[in-house]
Amino acid sequence: HIEGDYLHHILHKITEGWRGQMDFYCTVYGGGIHLIDLMRWLMSEEIKEVTSMGTSIPVKNSNYKWMDTITSLLKWEKGATGKTTTCLAPVRNKFHSLNIYGTKKTFINDRPSGKLFNTAGDNVSHIKVKDPYPGMAKGDMLPDFINSIRKKNKPDVNEIDIFRVMTVCFGIWEATKKKK
């Protein structure tokens, strides 16, 4: 089982900024896509099924007419399950949660450090993972992308991966609208 959540208090960006002025804006397309992409990459397989629901409680008295929070359950082609939440309203620090629950090890992305569990039980201990979070600046991957356009090189993330993660996000939005 794997979980990835995009948690970022940016209500002002969707109620007062350009996102809220668009004919349509989906929080999964703008935020959650990053965790969905990461989970696909870590699992090395495709998501074959989604079910989703969302809420608009924090934005109900604003001009923003779309859901600010969407939670989805995912099923991978080999049977693994997952969960992703995109929430643009939590009162907390920005965080990209990633939890991987395995039968041999479990990884929990946390602050101030991640946790790696090698054993289970009541008196379980964990190894602190002290790698920097987020580990790179926001624009660090742009040079490769720009180079791939200018020099017609193959980018680190190709169009097939982009379209596959977008297909999952479209499926999440459709499931949310249909309440399935």
Predicted features along the sequence, with ranges:
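A generic structural signal for residues located within well-ordered alpha-helices
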Residues: 31-34, 137, 160, 164
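Phosphate/oxyanion-binding loops and surfaces in catalytic or ligand/nucleic-acid-binding neighborhoods
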Residues: 42-46, 103-107, 169-176
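NAD(P)-dinucleotide binding in Rossmann-like oxidoreductases
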Residues: 60-67, 76-141, 158
